[in-house]
Regions:
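Repetitive helical segments and hydrophobic/amphipathic motifs
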Residues: 13-14
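Long, terminal "pre-/pro-" and other extracytoplasmic accessory regions
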Residues: 2, 6-8, 18-146
Length: 146
């Protein structure tokens, strides 16, 4: 009986902790992980950072950076790219794996890649014609959302 109550209380506590979300807090460029700073300097050398925040989520802390051009980039705690949204602009070459770029150019020659997200098992690509593609880790299209 005591063990059952303990498990119920533990489940409630863990559930509450997972739902409790710390607010994003502003950070300076120097507080971003080195890999994130390098990514921004290489891919957006002439774009200034409007603001950067850190989400201190207990499970997966991450950083979000918004550039003056409106580009939003999300990094994991180590500075690895998680997501990029370009708000109607083409994402610079070199950010997206060449296999995805070539596939998009082959099937959608007149559109730009405007969004890219790296998941644990998939990639998601947003195109300027509002089509969204989901690919597996072998770059096979597994879902098309239009």
């Amino acid at each position: 009986m005591i063990m059952k109550r303990f498990l119920i209380v533990l489940t409630c506590v863990l559930g509450t902790m997972s739902l409790a979300k710390a607010d994003d807090r502003p950070v300076t460029v120097d507080q971003l992980p080195q890999a994130a700073r390098t990514f921004l300097n290489v891919n957006f050398p002439d774009d200034k950072i409007s603001f950067a925040t850190k989400d201190d989520d207990l499970i997966r802390p991450d950083y979000q950076v918004v550039l003056a051009s409106g580009v939003m980039v999300k990094f994991n705690n180590a500075g690895g790219l998680e997501e990029i949204e370009s708000r109607g602009r083409e994402i610079p070459d070199g950010i997206i794996p060449i296999q995805i770029v070539e596939m998009v150019k082959g099937h959608y020659p007149d559109v730009m890649i405007t969004g890219y997200e790296v998941g644990r098992r998939t990639y998601e690509v947003k195109l300027s014609n509002r089509i969204e593609l989901k690919l597996d880790r072998n770059f096979n299209v597994i879902e098309i959302d239009d």
